[in-house]
């Protein structure tokens, strides 16, 4: 059980865990089990994620997942017989703020591991503070563009190979060969599009145009006109919030879907379904490691989903594109590694994490590829229908990330 006393009250909408946390400063929370006492040597787990800013919906879900997993660990007696203390810092969708707050986790709190970061630009901003300067293990839970091979940094979200190799051929078969790549102007879209273009062209498709926009752009009238006038079949989107909602709405109003166009977006999940009216994204295709639609057929996924919804009812959903599944996977792999290592120092845990496996998780089992610092996992293609997703394709087994 968690301490319910607040030393300072700070409420962020319906951010579920704040009512059970000790707020230790602006954007800082500590969650400690009641059975922890001065005689116990705490294992300190740091979470650095966007609780505020445009990606706050994702960060709040990720922090809730961390709270759920740590509660399970502590209710079972902790790790190595020691309580796990959860320390959460707001990266605020702002890299300069994030660096300062992550530095607190490393220098002041001396955490044993940090998990977090949503965008790749955020990961790049905080990884040096954690790994190089802080000599601390770092787990990055979000789907991303690949090519992150920093020592002591482990990735537990999907890579371009996992999201594109089977998904793009499906799009060509179920959408068409003429692709547009409208994109936010930062590292993830730029690097992902290089990979996506190769897969499109090697499967007989064609990239009609590839464009990049400021992250805060909300007027896409010229882009929509270009899509319509060039008879684009498939929009392979990497525009992110706050721009993605207006973009999809403008595309819908221009008749793209009505005229047979296919929307696709590899980070779209149950959280982002709520960005637009259901009819504005009907038929949108996504490829992720988990969708809630899997729960009727997968008891392990159903159990995880139900536990999350019981503890955290509200608008911040357990969803893959928001890194909630990567957060769950990362924490369970870390737990397995600590148990194997029998200690929490960086080198020992990293050596065990390098080959860690979990038999059950959202979407299925997962395992680190030895020497590669990335996960094999199952992948699913789903299509938006009436405000939910239908699974339309799935990998035959665990998909190799093909990284490092």
Residue ranges and their predicted role:
Residues 69-79:
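Flexible, small-residue-rich helix->loop connector segments that border functional cores
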Residues 1-10, 14-24, 33:
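N-terminal secretory signal peptides
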Residues 46-67, 89-95, 118, 182-190, ...:
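Extracytoplasmic "Venus flytrap"
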Residues 310-324, 331-391:
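Segments of small-molecule ligand-sensing domains
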Residues 107, 111-212, 261-286:
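Extracytoplasmic ligand/sensor domains, especially the bilobed periplasmic-binding protein
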Residues 28-49:
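C-terminal segment of N-terminal export signals and the immediately downstream linker at the start
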Residues 57-64, 77-147, 156, 214-220, ...:
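Beta-alpha junction/loop-to-helix N-cap segments that form part of ligand/metal-binding clefts
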Residues 251-328, 395-402:
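Extracellular/periplasmic periplasmic-binding protein-like sensory domains
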């Amino acid at each position: 059980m968690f301490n319910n006393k607040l030393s300072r009250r700070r409420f962020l909408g319906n951010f579920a865990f704040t009512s059970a946390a000790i707020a230790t400063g602006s954007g800082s929370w500590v969650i400690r089990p009641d059975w922890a006492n001065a005689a116990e040597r705490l294992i300190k787990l740091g979470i650095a994620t966007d609780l505020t800013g445009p990606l706050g919906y994702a960060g709040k879900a990720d922090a809730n997942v961390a709270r759920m997993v740590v509660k399970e660990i502590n209710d079972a007696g902790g790790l190595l017989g020691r309580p796990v203390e959860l320390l959460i810092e707001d990266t605020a969708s702002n890299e300069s703020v994030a660096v300062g707050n992550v530095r607190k986790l490393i220098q002041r709190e001396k955490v044993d591991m940090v998990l977090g970061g949503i965008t790749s630009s955020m990961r790049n901003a905080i990884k040096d503070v954690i790994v190089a300067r802080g000599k601390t293990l770092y787990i990055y839970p979000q789907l991303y563009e690949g090519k992150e091979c920093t020592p002591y940094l482990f990735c537990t979200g999907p890579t371009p190979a996992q999201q594109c190799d089977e998904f793009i051929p499906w799009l060509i078969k179920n959408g068409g060969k003429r692709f547009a790549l409208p994109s936010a102007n930062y590292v993830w879209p730029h690097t992902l599009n290089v990979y996506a273009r190769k897969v499109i062209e090697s499967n007989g498709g064609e990239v009609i145009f590839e464009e990049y926009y400021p992250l805060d752009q909300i007027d896409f009238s010229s882009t929509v006109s270009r899509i319509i006038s060039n008879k684009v079949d498939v929009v392979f989107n990497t525009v992110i919030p706050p721009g993605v909602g207006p973009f999809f709405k403008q595309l819908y109003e221009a008749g793209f879907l009505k005229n047979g166009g296919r929307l696709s977006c590899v980070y779209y999940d149950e959280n982002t379904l709520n960005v637009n009216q259901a009819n504005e994204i009907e038929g949108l295709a996504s490829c992720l490691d988990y969708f809630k639609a899997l729960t009727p057929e997968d008891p392990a996924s159903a159990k995880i989903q139900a536990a999350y919804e019981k503890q955290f009812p509200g608008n911040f959903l357990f969803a893959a594109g928001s890194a909630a599944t990567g957060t769950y996977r990362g924490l369970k792999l870390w737990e397995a590694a600590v148990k194997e290592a029998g200690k929490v120092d960086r080198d020992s845990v990293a050596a065990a994490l390098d080959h860690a496996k979990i038999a059950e998780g959202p979407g299925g089992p997962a395992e680190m590829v030895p020497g590669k610092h990335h996960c094999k996992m199952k992948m699913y293609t789903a299509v938006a229908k009436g405000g939910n997703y239908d699974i339309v394709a799935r990998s035959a087994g665990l998909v190799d990330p093909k990284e490092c």
